[in-house]
């Protein structure tokens, strides 16, 4: 089964590297399409533009210039470079006819060469067989497609550390693949919200995602849990950063993400 996310990342090829779809509010965030979902749709377009399944995405950067609304989505892609081991694709992303984002992705053939791992997975308890998920209070529709189990910090505002995380279990997402990773990386309530006692919406300025494992994996089934670990260095000058590590239940690093958010004053 392709899963709901892959269905909602499907695009129509209009020719000359142009891909389009009509987006609804299934993957909705704070008054606009969820940033991780937009990144997934952009990656879907760039992957199709490259046209070779052996060339897996290794890194993707996206800058958000204005909100992405439901309705017409358009990606104008360009294969910037093709090589023996690396390929680069860019995309100009439009929402309702306006330029709303820019994306650049690097693709490469997975090679096991000179490997080592120095980052250790979080030593947190797995999801219990009868454990109930914790529902967030943000009212973000995208959260309805996941069950979340906090392990580091809580979903409460104020009084906490800028380090949060826990298990994420998709309900109807489909396989945890390269399209799912940007959504999962952007899913958890931001670590900064744990520090702020008063609500201050923070929206994505840019997101960079590094894919650190071949995907999908047999040990990460569609309904299986992955662990997200989020840290924020600081909220400074009206912008707040966030680093995210995504781990499999077996302790393998699946992806890393970093983003900067614009903090709105209320």
Regions found by a protein language model. Give the residues of each.
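Terminal targeting signals and extreme-terminal segments of soluble enzymes
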Residues: 1-266
